[in-house]
Amino acid sequence: MARVAVTVPTSAKRGEIIEIKTLAQHVMETGFRRTQTGELIPRDIITEFVCRYNGAEIFRAELRQAVAANPLIAFTTVATESGTLEFTWTGDNGYLANHKAEIKVV
């Protein structure tokens, strides 16, 4: 099972810029390394991260082999209304992780 950590403020003022931080536990194998016997280790990376705020996409990242293991993604958005932030990570070999966080806008 995929392990993720997300930091979102529980409340914010309307119009306030908020910072969101996410961390996904993943080895991010590039597909360029070889075993001791010379065999290529297959690529296994998170390929995409998406964040939706009350159903509307507010952030998307396409990840490549150069991204470190356990990628930390931080970004900002404007708090417009109370609701749900939904986070989705997808990747090679059927990798899928989801997380939801609530925010109250006053």
Residue ranges and their predicted role:
Residues P71-F75:
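Short strand-edge motifs at loop-to-beta-strand transitions and within beta-strands
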Residues A5-L63, A68:
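Contiguous segments within soluble domain cores/interaction surfaces
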Residues G83-G91:
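Short, aromatic- and glycine-rich surface loops/edge beta-strands on solvent-exposed regions
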Residues G91-H99:
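Short acidic/polar inter-strand loop motif in beta-rich domains
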Residues I17, T80-T84:
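Extracellular Ig-like/FN3 beta-sandwich strand-entry sites
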Residues E102-V106:
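Short beta-strand edge segments in extracellular beta-sheet folds
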Residues M1-A2:
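Proline/serine/threonine-rich low-complexity linkers at boundaries of modular beta-sandwich domains
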